[in-house]
Design a protein with these regions (language model features):
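Glycine-rich phosphate/pyrophosphate-binding loops
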Residues: 64-67, 71-88, 236-242, 315
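Short amphipathic, charge-patterned alpha-helical segments
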Residues: 69-73, 219-237
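Conserved phosphate/anionic-ligand binding catalytic regions in large, soluble enzymes, centered on
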Residues: 2-22, 73, 130-142, 146-148, ...
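Hydrophobic alpha-helical positions that pack around
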Residues: 37, 94-220, 232
Length: 380
């Protein structure tokens, strides 16, 4: 499993490490599983980042690719039950997945005795309830158990003690969908694409103020400038591109000086950015980046599970502080306070919700400071 690619979820955690950990883990006896025999495969299909739609398109176009990948994962790690945790706003994907699952059962590709092998794997779809925080794996597991979606403290990791207290693989749709391709072509063929530790291809989603939005699959190593100018053909408005946000609503705003950075996990980390799920949102020269920074704080206020104070309170105070800066009130002191708040959120939050919210805020503050001098207070 060492040749397995990095996951295609926001954290890009190596899928092979998760699988190996679950394979080696010993299930624990619980009230639900007194014999301690169960392991799980969970697909995170709660695609909630703004500007992302690759998961939805794949599930609607080829649900069997996801089913096959999850079945292989189950057989590989010794799991007999899988769940697809699907975003509730995807009714078409929900219908098509259930049709595909029924056909897979009828053809004996999943069930009690897969193709006469004596191996079992069962798979079901479960709908989320619309909470962005349930894209975080431990919140997802809480929701899947029928509880309020709230972040769990780690350790224990889900691979050791996940769904219903049992060893659980939690992978993204694109990660699991790539499994059959890797097995068919071989790890060497898959790793021939890309650069550094970023191997294979990435489903890049172009959105925002872009002339040609949509989904493109490219090998790692392509630059943002190539993606936006060559594939996206610039802005829809015709105005110059001012900023590019990569990695969803918690991604940094990148100015033109950083657009030649290759699409690579390590290269992005060096400039304080992240690739995330591959969503790219384009802003033209009319965009108010201070308003976008405030929106990031507002988004965190609305979507925080509320479990940890840095996220729950920090985002509220962050939005208030941005308003004060834009109103010209004690600008120097409030700017320092905003940076301190961001540092507390980054260092003290339990999960990426609060930990990454400072990314768009600080990048806007550092790269587009002139927008924070505006006397207009953004109201959201």
């Amino acid at each position: 499993m060492s040749a397995w690619p990095d996951g295609r979820g926001g954290a890009a955690f190596p899928a092979g490490i998760k699988w190996q950990t679950v394979l080696d883990a010993v299930p624990q006896a619980t009230r639900r599983h007194p014999a301690g025999e169960q392991k799980y495969i969970v697909c995170n299909a709660d695609e909630g980042d703004s500007g992302t739609f690759a998961d939805r398109l794949l599930m609607e176009a080829d649900p069997y690719q996801l089913i096959e990948g999850m079945t292989i994962a189950g057989l590989a790690v010794g799991a007999t039950q899988g769940y697809i945790y699907l975003r509730s706003e995807y009714p078409v994907a929900h219908r098509l997945l259930n049709i595909a699952l029924q056909r897979a059962v009828e053809e004996n590709f999943i069930g009690d005795n897969i193709q006469g092998s004596g191996r079992a794997f069962h798979l079901e779809v479960r709908l989320g309830a619309g909470a962005y925080i349930c894209g975080e794996e431990t919140s997802l597991l809480e929701s899947l158990e029928g509880k309020r979606g709230m972040v769990r403290a780690k350790p224990p990791l889900p691979a050791i003690e996940g769904l219903f207290g049992q060893p659980t693989v939690v992978n993204n749709v694109l990660t699991l969908a790539a499994v059959s391709t890797v097995l068919e072509s071989g790890a060497a063929a898959y790793e021939s694409f890309g650069m550094g530790r970023s191997r294979g291809t990435l489903a890049i989603q172009l959105a925002g103020n872009i002339k040609r939005g949509g989904l493109i699959e490219l090998a790692f190593g392509v630059t943002l400038r190539e993606i936006v100018e060559d594939y996206g053909q610039g802005t829809h408005s015709g105005l110059p591109v001012r900023a590019i946000q990569v990695g969803g609503p918690l991604g940094a705003f990148l100015p033109e000086s950083q657009w030649d950075t290759p699409l690579d996990y390590e290269a992005f980390a060096k400039i304080g950015a992240m690739i995330g799920h591959g969503g790219i949102v384009v802003f033209d020269s009319s965009a108010d980046m201070a308003a976008q920074a405030r929106f990031a704080m507002e988004f965190c206020v609305a979507e925080s599970c509320g479990k940890c104070t840095p996220c729950r309170i920090g985002a509220v105070r962050g939005a208030e502080t941005i308003d004060k800066i834009r109103a010209g009130r004690n600008v120097k002191a409030n700017t320092e306070l905003l940076r301190d708040l961001c540092d507390v959120m980054t260092q003290g939050s339990l999960c990426a919700m609060g930990g990454l919210t400072p990314n768009p805020v600080l990048s806007a503050l550092n790269q587009f400071p002139e927008d924070f001098a505006s006397p207009v207070i953004a109201t959201g």
